[in-house]
Amino acid sequence: MKALWAVLVVTLLAGCLAEGEPELEPEVTDRLAWQSGQPWEVALGRFWDYLRWVQTLSDQVQEELQSSQVTQELTVLMEDTMTELKAYKKELEEQLGPMAEETRARLAKEVQAAQSRLGADMEDLRNRLAQYRNEVHTMLGQSTEELRARLSTHLRKLRKRLMRDAEDLQKRLAVYKAGAREGAERGVGAIRERLGPLVEQGRQRTANLGAGAGKPLQDRAQALGARIRGRLEEVGNQARDRLEEMREQMEEVRAKVEEQAQQMRLQAEIFQARLKGWFEPLVEDMQRQWANLVEKIQASVAANPIPPSSVPQESP
């Protein structure tokens, strides 16, 4: 049990110190992510490699995104990862030995929450690619450069969130595994051996209750502080996720406004072309009529010249 609590404390301290540490480069993080090599981690590694290939947005990726092949591949990789993860979690649950019911329930709840977040990240990624395919189909031969830029930004953010939640799940499974290992190693003899020192410690604490009354309060305060730090970290992560979602929504609104402005410019150009098509024939017809009228007047004047006698002459 002490080993389990030690792992819990180390995990919480690592989470509290994470804000002050410099962010690792993506390549380094990738190498650290799946180092234990559990089956579910291997499956997630395949999903991760496929995602990195999709993120290149090469010509082949663009071609396959036009169909449902990419989303189908991601669905298969997602199902493989979740299946292996559930099997690994069930294996750990079977290995859990004598443990306080409250501790067991809390650990199971934390692992389930981390597992759900990872599954939601994968689902969001698949839905975003499906949305991109639909948007490309509605462009009707127009340029999709802006769509690709938006997709690249979203994939980068989703990939970062997926990595963070996967690492969080790894940490919680490590705590869960520590409890299972301790339960598997614990037997009746070990329990009896531990009960003796615990009873003796209880007697000593009872005898020294007056002198050491402040120690339990200090332990409780430290435990409460650890829980508060964990809660603050969780709230901070949720706030960052919400901020990223709001930024994505603002980018989508800006893109839609620019798209509508482009459509209005195109419609104005079309209307201008139509007006030009309507008035140019009228102007040309008026010019022809005016030219014909001038020619007729000139011809009439040439055919009927003014006689000289009609011009008055000066007397000598």
UniProtKB/Swiss-Prot annotation:
Heparin binds at residues 158-161, 225-232. The modification Phosphoserine is found at residue 143. Residues 262-316 are annotated as: Homooligomerization. It is found in: Secreted; Secreted, Extracellular space; Secreted, Extracellular space, Extracellular matrix; Extracellular vesicle. GO terms for biological process: acylglycerol homeostasis; cholesterol efflux; cholesterol metabolic process; lipoprotein metabolic process; melanosome organization; phospholipid efflux. The keyword Secreted applies. Residues 1-18 form the signal peptide. Sequence repeats lie at residues 76-97, 98-119, 120-141, 142-163, 164-185, 186-207, 208-229, 230-251. GO terms for cellular component: chylomicron; extracellular exosome; high-density lipoprotein particle; low-density lipoprotein particle; multivesicular body, internal vesicle; very-low-density lipoprotein particle. The modification Methionine sulfoxide is found at residue 139. Keywords: Chylomicron, Endosome, Extracellular matrix, Glycoprotein, HDL, Heparin-binding, Lipid transport, Lipid-binding, Oxidation, Phosphoprotein, Repeat, Secreted, Signal, Transport, VLDL. Residues 76-251 are annotated as: 8 X 22 AA approximate tandem repeats. Residues 154-164 are annotated as: LDL and other lipoprotein receptors binding. Residues 274-286 are annotated as: Specificity for association with VLDL. One of its GO terms (molecular function) is cholesterol transfer activity. InterPro entries: ApoA_E (IPR000074), Apolipoprotein_A1/A4/E (IPR050163). Residues 206-286 are annotated as: Lipid-binding and lipoprotein association. SUPFAM superfamilies: Apolipoprotein A-I. APOE exists as multiple glycosylated and sialylated glycoforms within cells and in plasma. The extent of glycosylation and sialylation are tissue and context specific. Glycated in plasma VLDL. Pfam families: Apolipoprotein. Homotetramer. May interact with ABCA1; functionally associated with ABCA1 in the biogenesis of HDLs. May interact with APP/A4 amyloid-beta peptide; the interaction is extremely stable in vitro but its physiological significance is unclear. May interact with MAPT. May interact with MAP2. In the cerebrospinal fluid, interacts with secreted SORL1. Interacts with PMEL; this allows the loading of PMEL luminal fragment on ILVs to induce fibril nucleation. APOE is an apolipoprotein, a protein associating with lipid particles, that mainly functions in lipoprotein-mediated lipid transport between organs via the plasma and interstitial fluids. APOE is a core component of plasma lipoproteins and is involved in their production, conversion and clearance. Apolipoproteins are amphipathic molecules that interact both with lipids of the lipoprotein particle core and the aqueous environment of the plasma. Belongs to the apolipoprotein A1/A4/E family. This is Apolipoprotein E. It comes from Peromyscus leucopus (White-footed mouse).
